[in-house]
């Protein structure tokens, strides 16, 4: 019986396909792609520093530092969001696995109860048949006594 449960759990895990998890994965991929694009843009900003002259260097540097600070904050918030989404995905996967385990145990319990019901119905039929035979014999005995006294 233990092997049956393990086999059922393995089958449930293999058959598991959660569209919500797939969409979460797609969202994660899109956000990682956005992050890569922003990093590439940040690299472009640092490469274009050679053509500045005199006072423009300071204002250009300030603009780059501002942009860098903004992008770093955004990157940090996106990384936190990614971490949070990964935790949500892990929790949902755990809940899904727990639900599948409950379904499997419920199915097994249902099968056991169905077998018990079948056995009890069979036993009931046998008891009714024995009782009817006994009652028939008693009736025949009474009838023979009545016929014998007449």
UniProtKB/Swiss-Prot annotation:
Chief place of localization: membrane
Gene Ontology MF terms: identical protein binding; protein-macromolecule adaptor activity
Record annotation: effect of changing residue 46 to A: Impairs interaction with ATG5and autophagy
InterPro entries: Autophagy-rel_prot_16_dom
Coiled-coil region list: 58-130
GO-annotated biological processes: autophagosome assembly; autophagosome organization; autophagy; autophagy of mitochondrion; cytoplasm to vacuole targeting by the Cvt pathway; macroautophagy; nucleophagy; piecemeal microautophagy of the nucleus
Membrane topology label: Peripheral membrane protein
Positions with biased composition (Basic and acidic residues): 7-17
This protein's UniProt keywords: Autophagy, Coiled coil, Membrane, Protein transport, Transport
Gene3D superfamilies on file: 1.20.5.170
GO CC annotation, single: phagophore assembly site membrane
Subunit structure: Homodimer. Part of the 350 kDa complex which is at least composed of ATG5, ATG12 and ATG16. Several units of each may be present in this complex. Interacts directly with ATG12.
Additional detail: Present with 573 molecules/cell in log phase SD medium.
Family: Belongs to the ATG16 family.
Protein name: Autophagy protein 16
Species the sequence originates in: Saccharomyces cerevisiae (strain ATCC 204508 / S288c) (Baker's yeast)
């Amino acid at each position: 019986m233990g092997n049956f449960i393990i086999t059922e759990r393995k089958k449930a895990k293999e058959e598991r396909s959660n569209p919500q998890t797939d969409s979460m994965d797609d969202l994660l991929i899109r956000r990682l792609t956005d992050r890569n694009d922003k990093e590439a843009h940040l690299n472009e900003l640092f490469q274009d520093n050679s053509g500045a002259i005199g006072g423009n260097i300071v204002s250009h540097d300030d603009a780059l530092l501002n942009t860098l600070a903004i992008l770093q904050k955004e990157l940090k918030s996106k990384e936190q969001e990614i971490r949070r989404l990964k935790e949500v995905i892990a929790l949902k996967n755990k809940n899904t696995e727990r639900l599948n385990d409950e379904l499997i145990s419920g199915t097994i319990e249902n099968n056991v109860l169905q077998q018990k019901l079948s056995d009890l119905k069979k036993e009931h039929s046998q008891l009714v048949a024995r009782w009817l035979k006994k009652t028939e014999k008693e009736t025949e005995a009474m009838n023979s006594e009545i016929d014998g006294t007449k």
